[in-house]
């Protein structure tokens, strides 16, 4: 073997371990700010340890995982990475609250072809902010630099969350009955769903992202982070007999509301009970999207739909609004015939 042969390193192959270590140093403060008393140890171990909160008698663990879809492409195009982490946390923890679970801890996965420490630190800082809003601890994650797998400095993110709920307090939809009221909790925009259609609308309409709509640019409307409902929803759950909660994500009203309804019931939604936020009207007009498809793809201004006894509805709405949400009665539960659609929008 020749002594003149070049000695290759991992960095020569496109993986910079030093950059990864620099990122870990940058995010230690973010992780610390999210800490809960149940968390044992710090980041950097092979696994993270977390005790169950002592207030639970028969705790059930509830888990969820999600990403932010092609909203990432918009963030990359706008070079705006500081809120995409909030979206990531929101998509995971809002799924947990559907079953009444309090989020305990969160882990993230960040994959890229070439690690840009500044961009990654922005993303993780957003994840930390999302965890603070949700009251859960960021206890670990994985940063994968994978040359040849992603174009340039493109990246993808995924989140994993574990929460806890008292066994007797699980919200599973079995108590939903005809006569229940339906409450809507407003969204902050499209959240993290429908962005492939949004990007197609932008393409075919040749829209200007700097165009102003209600005092904000179209870009600002579309990159607005997903709302995290945990703290207000937990308070509502503690004070009211909640029968079901639906998180309006991909599939919109038609797909998500039936997921929490028992057979023989349907949700009757009053389409006149709210006005769509302006960005949804803009998207519908620019893309010539029919109303059925809008409700199938987007949340149309509704992030959560809650079923509860009719006599508790107004108090629950008042509580949510006092907590800073925009909530209103959106409809009711009715009996459904066999084979009938479980969502009706009037």
UniProtKB/Swiss-Prot annotation:
Belongs to the AIR synthase family. One of its GO terms (biological process) is adenine biosynthetic process. It comes from the Bacteria. CDD domains: PurM. Keywords: ATP-binding, Cytoplasm, Ligase, Nucleotide-binding, Purine biosynthesis. It comes from Aliivibrio fischeri (strain MJ11). One of its GO terms (molecular function) is phosphoribosylformylglycinamidine cyclo-ligase activity. Its EC number is 6.3.3.1. Its main location: cytoplasm. One of its GO terms (cellular component) is cytosol. It catalyses: 2-formamido-N(1)-(5-O-phospho-beta-D-ribosyl)acetamidine + ATP = 5-amino-1-(5-phospho-beta-D-ribosyl)imidazole + ADP + phosphate + H(+). Coiled coil: none annotated. InterPro entries: PurM-like_C_dom (IPR010918), PurM-like_C_sf (IPR036676), PurM-like_N (IPR016188), PurM-like_N_sf (IPR036921), PurM_cligase (IPR004733). Signal peptide: none annotated. It is found in: Cytoplasm. This is Phosphoribosylformylglycinamidine cyclo-ligase. Pathway: Purine metabolism; IMP biosynthesis via de novo pathway; 5-amino-1-(5-phospho-D-ribosyl)imidazole from N(2)-formyl-N(1)-(5-phospho-D-ribosyl)glycinamide: step 2/2.
């Amino acid at each position: 073997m020749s002594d003149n042969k070049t000695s290759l390193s991992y960095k020569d192959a496109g993986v910079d371990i030093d950059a990864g270590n620099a990122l870990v140093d940058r995010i230690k403060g973010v992780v610390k700010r999210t800490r809960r008393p149940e968390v044992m140890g710090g980041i950097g171990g092979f696994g993270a340890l977390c005790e169950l909160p002592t207030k639970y008698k028969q705790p059930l663990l509830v888990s969820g995982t999600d990403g932010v879809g092609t909203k990432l492409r918009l963030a990359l195009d706008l070079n705006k990475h500081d809120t995409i982490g909030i979206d990531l946390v929101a998509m995971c923890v809002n799924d947990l609250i559907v079953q009444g679970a309090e989020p305990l801890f969160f882990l993230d996965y960040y994959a890229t072809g070439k690690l840009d420490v500044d961009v990654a630190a922005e993303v993780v800082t957003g994840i930390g902010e999302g965890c603070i809003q949700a009251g859960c601890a960021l206890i670990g994650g994985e940063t994968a630099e994978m040359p040849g797998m992603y174009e340039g400095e493109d990246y993808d993110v995924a989140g994993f969350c574990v929460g806890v709920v008292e066994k007797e307090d699980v919200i599973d939809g079995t108590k939903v009955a005809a006569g229940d009221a339906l409450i809507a909790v407003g969204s902050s925009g499209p959240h993290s769903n429908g962005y492939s259609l949004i990007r197609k609308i932008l393409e075919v309409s040749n829209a200007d992202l700097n165009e102003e709509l209600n005092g904000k640019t179209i870009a600002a409307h579309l990159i607005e982070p997903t709302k995290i409902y945990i703290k207000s929803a937990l308070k509502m759950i503690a004070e009211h007999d909640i029968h079901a909660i639906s998180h309006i994500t991909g599939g919109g009203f038609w797909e998500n509301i039936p997921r929490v309804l028992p057979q023989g019931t349907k949700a009757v939604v009053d389409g006149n009970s709210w006005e769509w936020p302006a960005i949804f009207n803009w998207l519908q007009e620019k893309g010539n999207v029919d109303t059925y498809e809008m409700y199938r793809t987007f949340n149309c201004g509704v992030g959560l739909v809650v079923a509860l006894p009719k006599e508790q509805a107004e108090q629950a709405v008042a509580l949510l609004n006092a907590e800073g949400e925009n909530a209103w009665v959106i409809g009711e539960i009715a009996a459904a015939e066999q084979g009938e659609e479980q969502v009706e929008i009037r």
